[in-house]
Structures are given as C-alpha cells and as structure tokens.
Amino acid sequence: MFVAMSRFTVGNDMTAEVKEAFRNRPHLVDQAPGFQRLDVISPADNPDEIWLITYWSDENSFTIWHRSHKFREVHKWIPKGLKVVSKSVKLRPFHHVCS
C-alpha cells in the first residue's frame, strides 16, 4: 500500500468553508484506479492546518492520478477566495508498513 499525505494551512478566515467543502467533495478521486480512501484531518492545536491522507494500492496509481486532468479538476471546488499560508503546502509519500 502507498500513502500520500499533503498538508496546507488556511491563511484567511475560511477554515470552516474549506472543511465543509471537503465534507461535500465531489468524490472524483474515488473512481481512480488503485484509490482506497481519503482521510481529511486537522490538528486539535492548529485547526487552520488541513491534512489530506490518501491510501492507494500502489505508488504508480497515485502518480497517474496526481498527473491527471481529473486531479486538476478536483481543485475547482475549493472555496473561492481561499488563501493558503505560503510554504505551508507539503506533499509527502509514504510506504505503508503495517496496521
């Protein structure tokens, strides 16, 4: 299993709108080959920080999705006016060891 974790911090007063957008997301990634699940989490001590954790059957499936047109399309539903703290955006790949 391959896991991709991405993080960003909301830089304006739109944290509630961003979280609501994730709750109502269009689920486009759900049909991607190899996709298993998406978790959206936020640290208790920093609610403006958003972590996206996607689980994939393999790294190649993630890479294909990440380079796809649909990946870019998914970002169209992000609330208009959202400002992200510069240098807060990070994507890290992981290999799942065990559960």
Predicted regions and their residues:
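Glycine-rich beta-strand-turn "strand-cap" elements at beta-sheet edges
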Residues: 2, 39-48, 76-99
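Short, surface-exposed ligand-recognition loops at beta-strand->loop->(often short) alpha-helix junctions
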Residues: 9-18
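Short, well-ordered beta-strand segments in beta-rich or mixed alpha/beta enzyme
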Residues: 3-8, 39-68
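Intrinsically disordered, low-complexity segments enriched in polar/charged residues with Gly/Pro
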Residues: 14-15, 26-28, 40-42
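An amphipathic, aromatic/His-enriched active-site/gating alpha helix that lines ligand/cofactor pockets
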Residues: 27-33, 55-89
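Hydrophobic alpha-helical membrane-association signature
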Residues: 21-22
